[in-house]
């Protein structure tokens, strides 16, 4: 349907976005980037084009290009009303959990985090948290914001952020981020989560990449270096190379 709509009217912004998103879901990232680039030429003031192209620049590890796109998107949404972003792959309740503004700040923060520009990552995540208006988006943002604050040795701010997290949060899809945050709070048994992580049937799932990076990072943070590195190596040995947790594991394992 996305391709048919695009072929019928390739200048329509929504058609461009959905066709580009579909191409990306099929792993055709370079083609998706080309579609969004065309969309930018046609709709240079549409922040959505930069947001989606930036996402695929992230996927393909073109981090500086991703940052440029997300910064442009951020400048285009100033003083504009936020809007919920429809999911390409809906969750179990078919309820979108992220908005245009939250996605722009979230992905910009991630791009800065992956390039080790933690000051700018923290600023982006702070803005993202302010527009994370449901528990799912909140825990996803809090996860990366917490890691960033720790990198900056802002331990008091990191601990204060953790205090806003609790087991009773009603989530639709981001339960893995909550699990990891509860491990950081020492309210979730890391060894039990590790046992589940090592279950071969789960290897390669997106969930396992998210849990794996969080778990590996936790073990590194408490001085269990061998265990931490082993888990991170397992994350990047699995096929979820397009996930943000995989990218972060790559970065953590860099010499």
Regions found by a protein language model. Give the residues of each.
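Canonical positions in the second alpha-helix
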Residues: 5, 38-39, 72-73, 94, ...
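Short coil turns that delineate tetratricopeptide repeat
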Residues: 10, 44, 78, 99, ...
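Residue-level recognition of tetratricopeptide repeat
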Residues: 21, 55, 110, 147-150, ...
């Amino acid at each position: 349907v996305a391709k048919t709509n695009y072929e019928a009217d390739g200048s329509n912004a929504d058609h461009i976005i959905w066709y580009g998103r579909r191409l990306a879901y099929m792993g055709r990232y370079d083609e998706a980037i080309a579609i969004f680039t065309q969309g930018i030429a046609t709709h240079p003031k549409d922040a959505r084009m930069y947001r989606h192209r930036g996402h695929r620049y992230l996927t393909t590890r073109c981090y500086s290009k991703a940052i440029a796109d997300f910064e442009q998107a951020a400048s285009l949404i100033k003083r504009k009303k936020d809007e919920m972003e429809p999911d390409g792959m809906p969750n179990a309740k078919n309820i979108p959990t992220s908005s245009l503004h939250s996605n722009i700040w979230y992905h910009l923060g991630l791009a800065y985090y992956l390039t080790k520009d933690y000051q700018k990552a923290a600023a982006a995540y702070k803005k993202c948290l302010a527009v994370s208006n449901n528990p799912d988006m909140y825990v996803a943002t809090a996860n990366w914001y917490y890691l960033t604050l720790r990198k900056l040795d802002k331990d008091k701010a990191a601990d204060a952020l953790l205090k806003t997290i609790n087991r009773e949060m009603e989530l639709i899809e981001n339960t893995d981020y909550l699990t990891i945050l509860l491990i950081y709070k020492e309210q979730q048994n890391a060894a039990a989560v590790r046992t589940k992580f090592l279950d071969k049937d789960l290897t390669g799932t997106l969930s396992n990449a998210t849990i794996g990076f969080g778990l590996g990072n936790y073990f590194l943070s408490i001085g269990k270096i061998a265990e931490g590195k082993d888990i991170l190596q397992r994350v990047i040995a699995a096929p979820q190379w397009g996930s943000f947790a995989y990218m972060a594991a790559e970065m953590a394992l860099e010499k």
